[in-house]
Structures are given as structure tokens and as C-alpha cells.
Amino acid sequence: MEPKTKKQRSLYIPYAGPVLLEFPLLNKGSAFSMEERRNFNLLGLLPEVVETIEEQAERAWIQYQGFKTEIDKHIYLRNIQDTNETLFYRLVNNHLDEMMPVIYTPTVGAACERFSEIYRRSRGVFISYQNRHNMDDILQNVPNHNIKVIVVTDGERILGLGDQGIGGMGIPIGKLSLYTACGGISPAYTLPVVLDVGTNNQQLLNDPLYMGWRNPRITDDEYYEFVDEFIQAVKQRWPDVLLQFEDFAQKNAMPLLNRYRNEICSFNDDIQGTAAVTVGTLIAASRAAGGQLSEKKIVFLGAGSAGCGIAEMIIAQTQREGLSEEAARQKVFMVDRFGLLTDKMPNLLPFQTKLVQKRENLSDWDTDSDVLSLLDVVRNVKPDILIGVSGQTGLFTEEIIREMHKHCPRPIVMPLSNPTSRVEATPQDIIAWTEGNALVATGSPFNPVVWKDKIYPIAQCNNAFIFPGIGLGVIASGASRITDEMLMSASETLAQYSPLVLNGEGLVLPELKDIQKVSRAIAFAVGKMAQQQGVAVKTSAEALQQAIDDNFWHAEYRDYRRTSI
């Protein structure tokens, strides 16, 4: 259902003059009416002409096009965001296809690497380990009191770029921009946070411009106690907040998720969001091919927390489709840098142990090696689906893709590693190596592939199709937790909007122009499932839909009325 338009009520504010112009959430720039200019002491502080937001957005678009590099475009958009947030979101929504890769992946990776160099203005909260005893005071300093969504990182595993220290702040800022642009969550409700626990990146430690704590990363008990202090302070300040963990290192990501997911409404987008969008993509791709996901054999390259999270969600989905757990697990094969995960492999991480194959079941495989490589696995398993979450470029070689295609006429290949410099294989190569037969979805955006005079659109398996809708659904329903079933409902809803399924052609995922519609549908499904699972108060479907409509923020200026503080 489309949101119902309603007249915005006037907003009563106490700020005036230059202070108002410096307030990004309230600043209208040249769009302040003459009456507002008189009432708020703005006469003479702005050019004479009163503009509409669309006129402002058109000027900003012209200026944007004058920048030649993606990082310069990113800096320009961040400057608008830090001076006039309403205009920023109107501009982004007008040009989402063009600007999403600039405000988030892949350009945000470069922005994180150069964070201290391109720093202009503070946004969000920086919590240094040295300030750990001032945690409550720090959160009290946040100017927006009604925070509903926090994205937090410690900067240790930023995309595929590794430890970026406080430069990782670019990720929470970018993620929350998408919560608003795609999911309609008011920017006044969002807070980006970086936990500055030091950095092991020697280049940053040696950089005179680096703005973070110049110290090796704290670890073990010190680290977990610090994170716990943060969580407890957040719970006290905003007990109903949705907390998203973002780009934590593999060794910490799953332990933190498992520790806090039943203590505070929280999830890890790298693990659960990536899994949800991948499963939604696979459900749609399987249906488009005339089958079910439970019929497919799946090979993963990359057995970290993200890869294993996707695998577990695939197993849950195939069980929903009728497989036993044992049968579901036998169809999923995990390969890391040491080869196929088997029950004979030493030093497995806890979350890997349920995803091993029994070595005794592989005795008839065509291989002489004790270490079973990706090529060995593809040759013997004959998979229908190949998923890359390795963070290493070029590992889907021509030999591997051709071997897969030899046994699978319509292979599904998903090189999901970010940014584009880390992708396991390019869509151009995959299409060519499979004679145009592969269905390709990537983690980073790629242009359509032209092969033998035919155009192949490349779907971006973008978490932005999932997490904004989850956030909106949690806020609208008042959910106290995010359950696995809520994530599964998001995947199923996403698959229902696949153009390839609906029309028999086009992308396997919706176009970005439809992302708000998809987010609202996911929000409804997530909210409904939250009610069914008892983590949200039950209401009628109409009441839930109305709550979604009421919470969906639009990038439009409101009339201001003056009041005293």
C-alpha cells in the first residue's frame, strides 16, 4: 500500500537567527518564507528569493554534476546533509540510482579510509575508551532526545578494507542515511556511533591527521566490558531503541550478537541483514527458474560470520520448504582459505561447527588432495548456486565458473564481497564464461553487462532492500526484539517483489525506484510477525498499516511557528 498523504502540522521551535540556519534538521535555507524570516530574525541573512525545495534540489543537482570524482561527490553530499538534512534527502530520493553508490558502497569505503583527511563537521557520537567512565554524560550530550535507531561500529572490519579506526564512522552515517532515504525513518530519530577502542592500522597510527585514539586496539575482557558499558548506557537512555551492530570483526561480531540480541532490540546487518537479502534473492531466483531453494546445492567461498549467517538462514528457509535439518545441511558446502569445512578440520570457530560436511561422506570424490579446494568442491558437488563472501578478488576463476556451468545450465553466481575491488569475479566475466546463462547478483553495484549484443542487468544484493524495512517495522510495531522469523518474513516479502518472478524478465531484485514501496511492505510483514511472536503488542492489520504510514517521514519542509524554550 502506498503511504497516505496528509497535511503536515506546523512545528513550534525556539531557535532563531544564525542558530536556526546552523541546525541541519531545521534549516530550510532559501526556502524560509518571508513570514518565517520576519518571525525568526532571518531578514537579510538570506537572498531575497524564496525558493521551493525542488528548486533548491535542482541547483544542488547541477552543482553535484560538476564534481568529477565519486569521493568529491560524496563530500559534497555530506556537506548538504550537515547543513540541510531535508534538502539532502529530497536530492537523494530524486536521484537514488545515481547517489546510493556515492553515499554508501562502494564510495563510502574511500570516505572511511580518508575520514580524518576529509573531516568537515561532527556528526554522531565518538566514544573513546579513555572516556569510558563518562558514558552517560556522552549520551546525554546527544542533541536529539528521541533516538529510535542507532548504528554502531568499532571500525575494525570496514567493508573489505579492514581496520579503519574511527574512520569507520562513515559506515553508520551512510547506513542511517539509507534508513531514512529507503525506509522513511526520520533523521531526527537516528544516531551514528563509533566506539573508539584504538586501531592496529599502523598507517593510521603514523598519520599526523588521524583523529582517533592513537593506541593499539583493546581486546578480551577490556573490550567486552567497554562494549557492555555502552550497551547498558544506551538501555538506560533509550530503552526501546533499535541497535544495529555494523562492521565488527569476525571474532567479535557473533559473540556480541548472541550476547545482546535477547537483552536489547538489536541485530547485526553484516550477518543477519546480508543473510536476509541473500535468501530473498535466492528464493526469487529459484522461483524464476521454476523451482524451490530446497532443490538447490549451494557452495560458499568464505566461511566467516557473514557467510555462515547466510548459510544458516538458507538452511532455515529450506526447512520451511519441507527438508529435514539433516537434509538441508547436506546441501550447503562451506569453503574457506583452508578448504572445505569438514568434521576433521581443526580449529573451527563455534559458528562453523554445524556447517561442516562429514569427511566419510566424501570418500568417493574425484580428488587426490587432503585439502579440498573450491575447484574440487565445485567439480564434485556440481552446485546450482555459488556465493562469494571471501573479501578476496578474483577467486571465482574461469575454470571454476566453467566447471560449474558444465553441470548446471542456469547457474546462480553471487560474488557478494565489498567494495568492488574485492569482488570474487566481475559480472562481465561470469556472463562470458557461462555463455550468457548465469544469473548474477553482486554485493556492490555494477553496470549492465553487454555480451553478444544482449544486455544483462546485474542485480545488487544490497542490504538496503532489507534493513530499512526492518527498522520501520520495528518502530511502527514497537517490537522489543528482532527474531529469526521476522528476518525470514523480510526475505519472503522481498522475493515477492522480484521483477523476474512477477514478469518473467528483468532483475531478480526490485529497482531502486521501488525501494520505499518494498520497505513499507517489509515493515508490515516484520511488524505482523513480531506481533505473532509476542515481541510486539497485537493490533489489527489496519492499525499496523496506519502506524507505518504515521512513522514514514517525507523530505518536505514544514511551516514553523515560534515558541520560547
From Swiss-Prot:
Catalytic activity line of the entry: (S)-malate + NAD(+) = pyruvate + CO2 + NADH; oxaloacetate + H(+) = pyruvate + CO2
GO-annotated biological processes: malate metabolic process
Example GO molecular function: malate dehydrogenase (decarboxylating) (NAD+) activity
EC number(s) per entry: 1.1.1.38
Enzyme class: oxidoreductase
Residues binding NAD(+): R157, D270, N418
SMART domains: malic, Malic_M
Residues annotated as binding a divalent metal cation: E246, D247, D270
Matching InterPro entries: Aminoacid_DH-like_N_sf, Malic_enzyme_CS, Malic_N_dom, Malic_N_dom_sf, Malic_NAD-bd, Malic_OxRdtase, NAD(P)-bd_dom_sf, NAD_malic_enz_proteobac
UniProt entry keywords in alphabetical sequence: Metal-binding, NAD, Oxidoreductase
Name of the featured protein: NAD-dependent malic enzyme
Organism: Escherichia coli O1:K1 / APEC
